[in-house]
Regions:
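Peripheral, non-AAA+ core regions of ATP-driven protein-machinery
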Residues: 2-179
Length: 181
């Protein structure tokens, strides 16, 4: 599989969709990743709480433990809009998918109508997050076709009918499904 273990990467820009809950409102967030030449680093921007800043280490370690080699490249992650405070670990999965997409692992169309939300354990397993039902309900209203969430949140997510729910146990399971879209 491209990018799995050894190999060359087609570096570039990739964008995925996610969401966060602020008070009683769901705010959509675009997670953008750019992987390119420069001093090797993993930098995140976009009005981030400490939990979101900590995602950098969770994502890098989870990717490595899922078998993906992090390239020695400059990787910049932007969570937008910048005016919305990003809180919690809900962005771990979308950050990982955006980075892997920027590495050329997935086709661009793989995530165009999909919303991703979930925390990553260091072993690459998805951990439950709070607020999945309101996120899924708003994703449905916004026209998303599918929500990719932790398997442990799947029952809650399925309470919102009329939108496909993919409950995954691991980052690798998510990646394999997106590669074949």
């Amino acid at each position: 599989m491209p990018g799995k273990g050894k190999g060359e990467f087609n570096m570039g820009f990739y964008k995925v969709h996610s969401a966060t809950i602020l008070g009683l409102k769901v705010e959509f967030v675009q997670v953008e990743a750019d992987a390119g030449n420069g001093l090797p680093m993993f930098h995140m921007v976009g009005y981030l709480s400490s939990e979101v800043k900590e995602a950098a280490e969770r994502v890098r370690t989870a990717m490595r433990n899922a078998g993906y080699t992090m390239p020695a490249k400059k990787i910049v992650i932007n969570l937008s809009p910048a005016c919305v405070r990003k809180k919690g670990s809900v962005f771990d999965l979308p950050i990982a998918v955006a980075v892997l997409g920027a590495m050329g692992i997935f086709p661009e169309k793989a995530v165009e109508d999909i919303l991703l939300a979930g925390e990553l354990g260091l072993d690459g397993k998805l951990q439950p997050v709070e607020g999945i039902l309101p996120i899924v309900l708003e994703a449905k209203k916004a026209g998303f076709r599918c929500c990719v969430i932790p398997k442990s949140n799947e029952d809650e997510g399925r309470l919102a009918q009329g939108i496909q729910i993919f409950g995954a146990e691991t980052l690798e399971e998510v990646c394999l499904s997106l590669i074949h879209i």
